[in-house]
A protein has these predicted regions:
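Hydrophobic core
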Residues: 13-17
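Short solvent-exposed beta->alpha transition segments
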Residues: 30-32, 46-99
Length: 137
């Protein structure tokens, strides 16, 4: 009986871990940016909005973010590859209040758009790097 209960308890833990939402914010900016982009790659637009910084969520509504991102990703298709091009830490970004920021630039290729630059600006919030803005060129 104990082994059955132990097995059920372990199974419950595994299930709970599997359904728990992934948190994009980490103590390392490159990891945070990549995890956040993975949410978008997996069409988890609402979750990517929720995982953004306060600055991000104030600047764009969840509905607008979901709509714009969905339309754009449908146009360019799925990500084929993405490589970190550069990472920089700065104290200010254009049109943002002074703070601690990181910019992670990626060279990316999508199904229908090649040779892209994705720029993820992150801000340090409570010791975690959260996305403040996202641009693709």
């Amino acid at each position: 009986m104990r082994s059955i209960l132990a097995s059920l308890s372990a199974l419950g833990t595994i299930i709970a871990l599997a359904v728990s939402p992934a948190k994009a914010a980490t103590a390392e900016p490159t990891s945070s940016a990549y995890q956040w982009l993975t949410l978008i790659d997996n069409q988890k637009y609402a979750e990517s909005w929720a995982e953004g910084s306060v600055l991000f969520r104030v600047r764009v509504t969840e509905k607008s973010w979901e709509s714009t991102t969905s339309i754009f990703r449908e146009a360019v298709g799925h990500i084929v590859w993405r490589d970190v091009d550069s990472v920089s830490l700065v104290g200010e970004l254009p049109n943002m209040p002074d703070g601690q920021y990181a910019t992670v630039r990626y060279r990316s290729k999508f199904e229908r758009k090649t040779d892209c630059i994705e720029i993820v600006n992150l801000t340090l919030e409570n010791g975690l790097w959260r996305v403040a803005s996202y641009t693709i060129k």
